[in-house]
Amino acid sequence: MFFCTRFMSLIVFLTLVVAGCAQVPKEAGFNDVKDLVEQRVDYNIHWNQQTEADLEVEKAIKELLKEELTPEVSVQIALLNNPNLQAIYEELGITQADVVEAGLLENPVIFGQVRFPDKSSEDNNYEFGITQNFLNILMQPSRKKLSTIRFEQVKLHVANEVIQMVAEVRKAYFTVLGAKQIRDLRNEIALAAGNSFELAQRLHSAGNISDLELVTENAHFEQSRLELARSETALLDAREQLTRLMGLWGEQTDWRLPEQLPDLPSDEFPLEQLESMAVENRLDLAAERKAVEALALALGITIDWRWVGQIEVGVSTERETDRTWVTGPSLAIELPIFNQRQADIARLEAQLRRSQKRLTAQAIEIRSEVRSLRNRLIMQRNMVDHYRRTVLPLREQIVDLTLKNYNYMLTGAFDLLMAKQQEFEAYQKYLEAIRDYWIIRADMQRSLGGRLPGHMHSRQTIQTETAAESKKN
């Protein structure tokens, strides 16, 4: 009886100790995510956890918004402030809790019974006991290892979401800046069309042009007004998209942009060995590898323990009706007669094969995507160069020659205005080509895992730590 009492006390004590020591770290692997991100892009990230550092981040964002936005500043604001990204960071806390839970023992079960004798001369029968799931204790190391692998998978997934956000913000930035320039250009086209229509009205009043020519100029003018309205709507939509990505609202939405799209870089980044670089650096591919690793481990654990069912050990004590106590250990073992976990094994085998095939498919898709983006980037640069060196100079030459003919009275004012409008139209196509180049380049950066080969970002030095945190570090 003394041994059994000590055994019962030991179970309770160990359970309380383990439960008392188990705590969920607040950091939840975020530093690992920061390391993964900083290896690929030169931006700061911050997890809003209601600390003093959050105030420093708010101040930093206010300072950044005082100046015209650049692609780098827009990305930095989004990484610090985007609420969807903050929600994704919470996945770290959820999975960290799963890791902690995997290291916990199941709670012991205490039971008691009272039996009433059918003879009034005898005392009641009492029985008390405590049991513990012993299989849960034996499998604890395997559970912790499996949950750790899944935690690593989630960290890779979260870091990949940051890389995706960088690309989305850069694409949104160049979209809105291109829309701004196109809107300004469409405004000039509308003004030119308006001047042409006013001239047509005067000439028509003087009887120098026909009704058809007047109506034609009117139609051109109204069409230019529609195109201007369409460009203004596109600008507003693009601006709101960037505002959403940066997580701004209220007075913060009154941010400013530069006047024009940046020129193309003078030299393109190296275009060799891009596929292998992408396969090596892509975090979503690394996360899928972790998924395969986790399923393989889960399958191995299930196979190893398929013949071991539920095992419960404990101790119980009973007072008989004659007031004598009977105490001893208890053992309950599940016999795997009907269910040897065949279904679990088959399910995990299928899930593992599915994950392996997904991994192969994803690697193929990444290689294909990189090749496609490389081709598009080359073609887009060639298109921009063709507009700059050939199309635009030709349009300028047409305007100059038409102006000379107009001065010599060899052509009419409408021809000159039409030539100028066509020059504007060509310039709009040129702006769209530059915009699309930068969007494709942002996609290429994402496709390669975050960093372009041979390309260094300008680091955004934004302090997001409190002085106290800096001292700790």
PLM segments and residue spans:
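Periplasmic alpha-helical coiled-coil/stalk elements that build and connect Gram-negative outer-membrane
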Residues: A22, Q140-S142, I149, L156-M277, ...
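A small-residue-enriched
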Residues: A22-I45, Q76-N136, R239-L248, E272-A343, ...
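Short segments within alpha-helical structural elements
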Residues: G194, Q223-G250, R358, I366, ...
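Amphipathic alpha-helical coiled-coil scaffold segments and their short linker/junction regions
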Residues: L64, S74-N81, L146, Q153, ...
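Terminal intrinsically disordered/low-complexity segments used for targeting and assembly
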Residues: F2-I77, E232-M277, Q445-N473
